Regions:
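Outer-membrane beta-barrel initiation region
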Residues: 22-100, 104, 111-112
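Hydrophobic, lipid-facing positions within transmembrane beta-strands of outer-membrane proteins
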Residues: 54-56, 72-76, 104-108, 135-139, ...
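Solvent-exposed loop/turn segments connecting transmembrane beta-strands
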Residues: 64-72, 94-104, 126-136, 156-165, ...
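Residue-level signature of outer-membrane beta-barrel architecture
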Residues: 80-82, 112, 143, 157, ...
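Repeated loop/turn-to-beta-strand initiation elements of outer-membrane beta-barrel proteins
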Residues: 84-89, 116-120, 147-151, 176-181, ...
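Outer-membrane beta-barrel "beta-signal"
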Residues: 210-215, 245-259
Length: 259
């Protein structure tokens, strides 16, 4: 089964789940028991649920240095749509000091709100960088978890039947209204090894960071921090055979901006 066909099935599944959730929502129509004096559906102003909005966020545009070399990393996303239905584009990757692009990931997703704080997402993912390209169907959820953690959990299936999963979580700790400390972690898993992309089955890699940003404006914030990147299990073994680092800690500097 191709990744495109699998993605189509995923999108249809999301639509069915979202439709069922909408059908189960309590009706907002007026009733005979409505208290006198409250506005009715005839007198209430029109709801803006169908207004189209757009948002672009570069969460990380940063350099990472170990004192000898500097790598550059990007992590951004954009969406366009209504309060309930959106089209998302997500992209991340790193430009290494030797000129190679690593860990490139781009996703195109349909997003449907299912609760106040969480959305279902489904679509396609392409791994495009200096290594062989891989395509996946994607299905997951994104939102604000209890204790105000931003959470993304996504599963993937390739046309060859390989499975993968990615979990990302972050938290904004306000020191002042403009000074914000953000811990973040991303974890990747794979069901089978892929020698072409040098990833092994099981827990593959972890990227974690602690960044302190200062919001000069709400739309522009420089930051400093520290980041850890590590490879584990079979992925770590593949890295050693290729004479690559299996983990390091680097100082980071960059900007966070949105529009």
């Amino acid at each position: 089964m191709s990744a495109f066909r699998t993605a189509t099935i995923v999108l249809l599944t999301i639509s069915a789940i979202a439709g069922k959730a909408s059908a189960q929502m309590p009706s907002m129509q007026g009733s005979d028991q409505q208290p006198p004096g409250l506005p009715t559906t005839e007198t209430m102003p029109p709801v803006m649920d169908n207004r189209i909005f757009g948002h672009v966020l570069f969460d990380q545009l940063e350099g990472r240095t170990d004192g000898r070399n500097v790598n550059f990393k990007w992590d951004g996303q954009a969406w366009l749509g209504t309060d309930y239905d959106k089209l998302w584009v997500k992209s991340e990757g790193s430009y290494q000091h030797d000129g190679k692009v690593d860990d490139g990931r781009t996703e195109l997703l349909y997003d449907r709100a299912i609760t106040t704080y969480f959305d279902l997402q489904g679509g396609i993912r392409s791994d495009i960088d200096s290594q062989p390209t891989r395509n996946w169907a994607a299905f997951g959820a994104q939102g604000l978890a209890p204790l105000f953690f931003d959470l993304e959990a996504t599963g993937y299936i390739s046309g060859q039947g390989h499975l993968a999963a990615r979990i990302q979580a972050s938290y904004d700790l306000l020191i002042t209204q403009r000074l914000i400390l953000q811990p973040e972690i991303e974890v990747n898993f794979y069901s089978k090894s892929d020698l072409g992309r040098r990833v092994g089955a099981g827990l593959s890699d972890i990227d974690a960071g602690l960044r302190l940003r200062y919001e000069i404006t709400r739309k522009f914030a420089p930051y400093l921090g520290v980041a850890y990147s590590g490879k584990f299990g079979q992925t770590s073994n593949l890295a050693r055979r290729a004479d690559e680092n299996t983990g390091d800690v680097r100082l980071v500097f960059g900007i966070r901006t949105w529009l």
